Amino acid sequence: MAQQQTGSRKRKAPAVEAGAGSSSSQGLAAADGEGPLLPKKQKRPATRRRLVHYLKGREVGARGPAGLQGFEGELRGYAVQRLPELLTERQLDLGTLNKVFASQWLNARQVVCGTKCNTLFVVDVQSGHITRIPLMRDKEAGLAQAHQGCGIHAIELNPSKTLLATGGENPNSLAIYQLPTLDPLCLGDRHGHKDWIFAVAWLSDTVAVSGSRDGTVALWRMDPDMFNGSIAWHSEVGLPVYAHIRPRDVEAIPRASTNPSNRKVRALAFSGKNQELGAVSLDGYFHLWKARSTLSRLLSIRLPYCRENVCLTYCDELSLYAVGSQSHVSFLDPRQRQQNIRPLCSREGGTGVRSLSFYQHIITVGTGHGSLLFYDIRAQKFLEERASSSLDSMPGPAGRKLKLACGRGWLNQDDVWVNYFGGMGEFPNALYTHCYNWPEMKLFVAGGPLPSGLHGNYAGLWS
């Protein structure tokens, strides 16, 4: 693979803390799930936890670690069902940044985010401290000036959490950073995309795929020689340098006869079990590729709801893709000709589904109206609020859909806000991104105002 190197006058970013216990490239779908997951209000001292494990093992007649693992699995399932109603919000101050589009947990304290104003930063959810990460620049740096206003739409960590993929200063280019230091490793700016990158998915620790507004998906392979430090730093002046790489494969999605100009790739999701890559395009189609050393398209399916299909996630346990649209979440099993799970309606005033994530049988839905909803795939219904009739009774369903309403965030009250929106005092934020840290039982949620002309942000830690 031909490589070129570029220097960047970047101060070295502080190393992020090791030991991340968070959701990965598919949000909830790949959360680590280490240890028993107890709601915070029900945590017990370690000695009491061990006693509970022992007694539970005796109760079911189990012996050894297998019994404990089974009980921990039960606890994890219980936590998945009960956690949403136990969460409370603490808003984070992001200053004047504009609309957070993407986020991922790096460890128990730090979340990396990308914004519409093309800012890549790490926020410490405990202290609120923000560290900006310099963006990588194309070999032809002037090209980035023509793409103001796009921003960073995707951030994904590889399975081992040693590499981070996102956009460069030019949103057409794929940037790869090393973790935990966030040193620049390489930039995919050669013979790649001709328009903005909207989505990224990792196929393995060294292979990533990007989806673009130009209607293509590109497969990138990171050379192992990049990791040995031989090209990581300029030996004389100490400037970080990075390789410039080209994709191993580029595939165009088929043109739909109904709207051939709107075949923009909006979201990607990878099935590790089947080694298949799913993609959603804005012309209302779902596409599936076999992902090996190259991409081989298997099928394209017309989606039942075709407007604003902007998010996609996959659940390995259920072998299901979930697609978020303007008013619905559709479920797809590419191996079934007849889909058995009916679409769910978000019923949020037509503001759309803006973010999705799976964990076990629960799907979390971030809406364009500033709320989080939780849907149980097995029961095929939304989680409901719980109400207790007395102190001695177990809480039961109250019959109302469980909805977490996010705070106001920050809104720039500029001329656009005054002239076009009448100076509305309350303006809900679209929840463009959310990610779970299951071992810490935390949920990071972020976004900003839905209208493109408004400038603002929201970020909150739910725990």
Swiss-Prot record:
UniProt cross-references to PROSITE patterns, sorted A to Z: WD_REPEATS_2, WD_REPEATS_REGION
Residue ranges, compositional bias (Low complexity): 15-33
Keyword match Cell division: no
GO cellular component, one term: Cul4-RING E3 ubiquitin ligase complex
Recorded superkingdom: Eukaryota
SMART domains (alphabetical): WD40 (SM00320)
Keywords, ordered alphabetically: Repeat, WD repeat
Region (Disordered): 1-48
WD repeat locations: 89-137, 138-184, 185-252, 253-297, 298-341, 342-401, 402-445
Similarity comment: Belongs to the WD repeat DCAF12 family.
Protein name: DDB1- and CUL4-associated factor 12-like protein 2
Lineage, uppermost ranks: Eukaryota, Metazoa, Chordata, Craniata, Vertebrata
